[in-house]
Amino acid sequence: MAKGEMILREEEEENNGIYYNAISHIYSALRPYVLEIKFDLQRAAQVINVSKRTLQRRLKEQGITFRQLRDNLILDIAMEQLQRGETVSRVAVNMGFSSISQFSRAFKRMTGIPPSRIAVRPL
């Protein structure tokens, strides 16, 4: 079985009593690449060694679009950086946003709270 096929298998597998579904495997495989400048559906499919169409079908089966997947991955990384103490402006740049306000709006749209509420403040 190819690596991509293993990542995208439809059934859930048990691993030490914890269930992982296909979307968890996709997230894990793509997370290191999501901040690449040209990270698109084609690149994601290449990373996990499947066709673009196969990746689209698998995501659809899981009830998620590629854009939602990418946004969720970026949000996860942004949350981690904010919780580690990075400034909102630094995280905005790290995530590839052209402005702090653009990042703040996108973050609030996805989470319901502004990134400044997540950021760790120095004592």
Question: Where in the sequence are the language-model features?
Answer:
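DNA major-groove recognition helix of helix-turn-helix
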Residues: 59, 66, 70, 106-107, ...
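Central "turn" residue of the DNA-binding helix-turn-helix
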Residues: 48-49, 60, 96-98
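Sequence-specific DNA-binding recognition helix
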Residues: 84-121
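Short alpha-helical "recognition helix" segments of helix-turn-helix
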Residues: 43-45, 91-92
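Short, basic, alpha-helical segments at the C-terminal edge of helix-turn-helix-like DNA-binding modules
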Residues: 70-80, 117-123
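Basic, amphipathic alpha-helical hairpins
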Residues: 11, 27-39, 79-87
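Short, Lys/Arg-enriched, Trp-marked, Pro/Gly-tolerant hinge/linker segments that flank
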Residues: 6-25, 43, 61-68, 72
